[in-house]
Amino acid sequence: MMSTYKRATLDEEDLVDSLSESDVYPNHLQVNFRGPRNGQRCWAARTPVEKRLVVLVALLAAALVACLAVLGIQYQTRTPSVCLSEACISVTSSILSSMDPTVDPCQDFFTYACGGWIKANPVPDGHSRWGTFSNLWEHNQAIIKHLLENSTASVSEAERKAQVYYRACMNETRIEELKAKPLMELIEKLGGWNITGPWDKDNFQDTLQVVTSHYHTSPFFSVYVSADSKNSNSNVIQVDQSGLGLPSRDYYLNKTENEKVLTGYLNYMVQLGKLLGGGAEDTIRPQMQQILDFETALANITIPQEKRRDEELIYHKVTAAELQTLAPAINWLPFLNTIFYPVEINESEPIVIYDKEYLSKVSTLINSTDKCLLNNYMIWNLVRKTSSFLDQRFQDADEKFMEVMYGTKKTCLPRWKFCVSDTENTLGFALGPMFVKATFAEDSKNIASEIILEIKKAFEESLSTLKWMDEDTRKSAKEKADAIYNMIGYPNFIMDPKELDKVFNDYTAVPDLYFENAMRFFNFSWRVTADQLRKAPNRDQWSMTPPMVNAYYSPTKNEIVFPAGILQAPFYTRSSPNALNFGGIGVVVGHELTHAFDDQGREYDKDGNLRPWWKNSSVEAFKQQTACMVEQYGNYSVNGEPVNGRHTLGENIADNGGLKAAYRAYQNWVKKNGAEQTLPTLGLTNNQLFFLSFAQVWCSVRTPESSHEGLITDPHSPSRFRVIGSISNSKEFSEHFHCPPGSPMNPHHKCEVW
């Protein structure tokens, strides 16, 4: 995500903590003034020499008292006292239990900060990863459960719909009674599936239109509505590559390395086919293998994410007529008019596409593929998305595949956790008001706004010191930073029952019919998407719901968003020292702010438009600075598998810039407000606590399978390298922890972008 603040050394801090008031003036240093046994001598009886000596002694004593007073003031100013409040003792205990103080912080700061936490927190059953974010999300889940199960007369109609949805999910008796019937009826309604019975041979276009709009699936490609990157005040239809059942093309193309996953995926497909009435396995398996082979063909033409980072290069705006020429396998005008009905689409409709080559190749692939296989593949997309809403047999099949895919150990997780997560994913904004009222203090927005303001100021201070950026680009960058809009806690409309009900007016939840409610929501969410096409983008439309433990930056809106779910401990606690808050939520704020200037965000101007607003000299200098990080992170590995320094570049830039901005902001805060009290027993300065707080946010564990998946899909580096990658580039970290030059956490060569 420097000042006059005294950066006390570790030894000085320990000494101060060990002194009590009686120790400051030990008895053997006390001075007693005693007169003669016969009483004091009269002043008049003293000789002139004695009188002069007495006056001199008095003056010297007065001077000594003055000096002691000055030293006392300086002592109090420079030496923070120890915080012994209940909150400080509690947070100290938490910090200590997470640490492994036997590890040298200059050798391995992540293990120093998180070693205790990792030993005490193996990956829980039913999970493939666990960390600070997971812990807080479980806390939020428990709150949501209570709110959903305890309805009140004052809730809005939208909130009641969320409660109906949740209760239908919890009605396992009804779900078990229906078994696979809801999905089997849906497949029949769509014209059938050759895996389970007869199918309509002439309905390719119709099936594609229905599964795209009514059920929000994305076979072959994805279609959605979003702000036009080059005209951010307008929404536009956008089309992009899609259609893989596994998380990344790498799973299909690196067959030897991923043989276990591919076998598990095929077995999962066969099992679902059998559960849906597909008959004998020797009939189902060959057809499912064909679907898997088709997905492999899609993977072969899918562009890797690391080659799609330059948005100026991949952005193309075409008309519907031009798209028809580019990808003729789809009858685009009927397709678009059907899914966007009642909006009328003609041949001149602008459409943004992100990979011409992919769309051309997928069109060729469709034309050269048997219609039966195309139908099987499209219905498989629907089955894969909807089977989790069916009975326990489908849950068991899903868990078995998750064990292969992510290393998740099968467990009997409480049903309510599944239902809370699904309700939040589906109707998170509808239940948002309940969560906000229960957890979000009225002044939290103001406090968060103040922190954001401090981080922005610190970022702009760093911006002014950059040597690689020309002055014109620097001026424009400052204007962009000034223009970043803050969204905190929740979108305003959710707290107005009338506005909230208006948003969810067209969605109806039916008691006790879980599958039906989920299908209705897919259709509703697509209708909401289609409805945006002729409207301007709206800041109140968030990509994350209020309970989410996360944050994000939107380049087309030039805004940073912090849901209520993350504005809690351990990221922020009003009773904790600000060293911890700046190291927690401060770094999160700095991270999102820096995204406005990472390798993708920097391409958007202050108004959210994709255009070349940098001078060429600064673009080239930026590429040189970022090349350092690509190499640095590319040298890290997990279980012998390297981190992709190119794919993770944007997040690595944000991690480093966020830490730097938050540190500078904390120094500014101390300069303005004075040194804080320190925490007891740790023997750490507040500057050291800042870095420790940052690191402990990322304490986490993952299964080997999940680590592999993260390395090939996640744009973030693994947690360990988010910590050591950032602090090893921080000169201030090495100063505060006294790391020798050349030690692992203080390399001679450091990378810096912002």
Swiss-Prot record:
Matching entries from Gene3D superfamilies are given as:
Collagenase (Catalytic Domain), Neutral endopeptidase , domain2
Q: What is its EC number?
A: 3.4.24.71
The task this protein performs is described as: Converts big endothelin-1 to endothelin-1.
Name the chemical reaction catalysed here: Hydrolysis of the 21-Trp-|-Val-22 bond in big endothelin to form endothelin 1
Q: Is Protein transport included in the keywords of this UniProt record?
A: no
Where does it localize?
Cell membrane
Q: What is the recorded name of this protein?
A: Endothelin-converting enzyme 1
Tell me the active site: E592, D655
**Which cysteines are cross-linked by disulfides?**
C83-C88, C106-C739, C114-C699, C169-C419, C628-C751
Is Repeat a UniProt keyword of this protein?
Answer: no
Q: Name one GO molecular function term.
A: endopeptidase activity
The top of its lineage is: Eukaryota, Metazoa, Chordata, Craniata, Vertebrata
This protein's cofactor list reads: Zn(2+)
Stated regulation of activity: Inhibited by phosphoramidon.
**Which note does the record give on the cofactor?**
Binds 1 zinc ion per subunit.
**GO CC annotations?**
membrane; plasma membrane
- Stretches of the chain found on the membrane's Cytoplasmic side: 1-52
> How is it placed in the membrane, per its record?
Single-pass type II membrane protein
